[in-house]
Regions:
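Conserved active-site helix of classical SDR/Rossmann-fold NAD(P)-dependent CH-OH oxidoreductases
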Residues: 18, 98-99
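Short glycine-/acidic-enriched loop or helix-start segments at secondary-structure transitions
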Residues: 14-16, 39, 85-86, 126-128, ...
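Alpha/beta-hydrolase active-site loop signature
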Residues: 10, 33-34, 81-82, 97, ...
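N-terminal Rossmann/SDR dinucleotide-binding element
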Residues: 1-73
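Conserved Rossmann-fold NAD(P)-dependent oxidoreductase catalytic core, especially the SDR/UDP-sugar
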Residues: 100-136
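SDR active-site strand-loop-helix element
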Residues: 6, 30, 74-78, 115-121
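NAD(P)H-binding glycine-rich loop region in Rossmannoid oxidoreductase-like domains
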Residues: 55-95, 123-126
Length: 136
């Protein structure tokens, strides 16, 4: 079985890839390898050589179609993470990309058996910073 992990070069994605490889799965990763997650915008050395790497963007349909074709299972871990208030970018990466994955699967009648979607801290944002004396 072949698995696609979006955001697979990140912390959770890379550990998921390692586990899936140990269990005998073939693994493909779609990742943008961009900052701030990847500090120098290059492919991390910790990724196993058996992983099929695709540099791409979950907000671009062409990249998603290529990544989804030929896989049986999808782990959708890709997320935009930054501390700047770029709300439209958060929504496009963290919400719209999930819908786009399902739309492509249905439209192209891809035989994908399962899609696992994980959230990230990015969905809630940073929140408000409040002074506190620690007693609240």
């Amino acid at each position: 079985m072949k698995v696609l992990i979006t955001g697979g070069a990140g912390f959770i994605g890379s550990h998921t890839a390692d586990r899936l490889l140990k269990e005998g799965y073939k693994v493909r990763i779609l990742d943008s390898f961009e900052t701030p997650v990847h500090h120098n915008s290059s492919i991390p050395e910790y990724l196993d050589d058996r992983i099929e790497l695709m540099c791409g963007d979950v907000t671009k349909e062409h990249d998603l179609v290529g990544a989804l074709t030929g896989v049986d299972i999808v782990y959708h871990f890709a997320a935009f993470q930054d501390y700047l208030p770029l709300f439209s970018k958060f929504v496009d990466f963290n919400v719209t990309s999930t819908a786009r994955i399902f739309e492509i699967i249905v439209r192209d009648e891809l035989p994908i058996k399962k899609v696992i979607v994980a959230s990230s801290q990015s969905t809630l944002g940073e929140g408000l910073y409040l002074d506190s004396d620690g007693n609240e």
